[in-house]
C-alpha cells in the first residue's frame, strides 16, 4: 500500500522512486512473484481502500486508485521480467524454484548453517556472501509451500551456505523454524536464484 501511495504522489515522475522500485522488484523476483499475482493483490488493496475510505467499489475514487495501481503493477512486472531474464541467462542461473539437497547442517545455539547443493548436479549461479536468496519448504501438516528470504553466508562453484536463526516462539509458518525442526542432511528444499541482478 505504501508503494502505491508513493507512486500516486509521484505519478508524473516515477523515476523518483527508482531506488525503492529496484528494492521491491528484487525481493519479488527472489520470492518468484508472478504477473498474475498482481491482480489478486490489486483487488484486495482496492477493497481495503474502499472500506477504509467508506466509498463504493464503483466510485471514481476507486477507479483512479485502480488506474494508479495498474500503472505501478505494469512497471514492476516489466522490471521483474528483465530481472528473471538476466538471472536465467547467466551461467548457472535459473528462474523460479530449484531443488537443492542439504549436504551439511552446523548448529551453534539457536543458529543453523545449512550447506546445500543442486539436486540436478548442474552449475549454480556464482554469488557473494550477503546476497539475498529465498528458501521454500513444505509446512508440516498443511498443503502449503512457504518461502522466506535469507542471506548467503558463502558459496562455492557447486554449493551455497545460508544461516538460519530461530526465535523462541516461532509461527507455525516460519521457514527458519521448519528448517531447524524438520529438515536434516539429505533432505531436499527449494531455492530461488541468488539475487545478483
Regions found by a protein language model. Name each.
Residues 1-97:
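Globin-like tetrapyrrole-binding proteins
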Residues 90-187:
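Ferredoxin-reductase
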Residues 189-191:
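Structural and coupling elements of P-loop NTPases
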Residues 193-197:
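A short, basic/flexible loop-to-alpha-helix module at the beginning of a structural domain
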Amino acid at each position: 500500500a505504501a508503494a502505491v501511495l508513493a507512486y500516486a504522489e509521484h505519478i508524473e515522475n516515477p523515476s523518483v522512486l527508482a531506488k525503492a522500485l529496484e528494492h521491491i522488484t528484487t525481493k519479488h523476483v527472489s520470492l518468484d512473484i508472478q504477473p498474475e499475482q498482481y491482480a489478486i493483490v490489486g483487488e484486495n488493496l482496492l477493497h481495503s481502500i474502499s472500506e477504509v475510505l467508506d466509498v463504493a467499489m464503483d466510485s471514481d475514487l476507486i477507479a483512479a486508485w485502480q488506474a494508479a495501481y495498474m500503472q505501478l503493477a505494469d512497471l514492476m512486472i516489466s522490471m521483474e521480467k528483465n530481472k528473471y531474464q538476466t538471472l536465467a541467462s547467466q551461467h548457472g542461473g535459473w528462474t523460479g524454484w530449484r531443488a537443492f539437497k542439504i549436504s551439511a547442517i552446523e548448529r551453534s545455539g539457536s543458529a543453523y548453517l545449512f550447506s546445500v547443493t543442486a539436486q540436478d548436479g548442474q552449475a549454480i549461479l556464482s554469488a557473494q556472501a550477503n546476497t539475498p536468496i529465498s528458501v521454500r519448504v513444505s509446512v508440516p501438516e498443511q498443503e502449503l509451500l512457504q518461502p522466506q528470504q535469507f542471506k548467503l553466508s558463502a558459496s562455492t562453484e557447486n554449493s551455497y551456505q545460508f544461516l538460519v536463526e530461530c526465535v523462541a516462539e516461532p509461527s507455525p509458518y516460519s521457514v527458519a523454524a521448519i528448517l531447524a525442526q524438520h529438515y536434516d542432511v539429505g533432505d531436499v528444499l527449494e531455492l530461488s536464484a541468488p539475487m545478483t541482478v
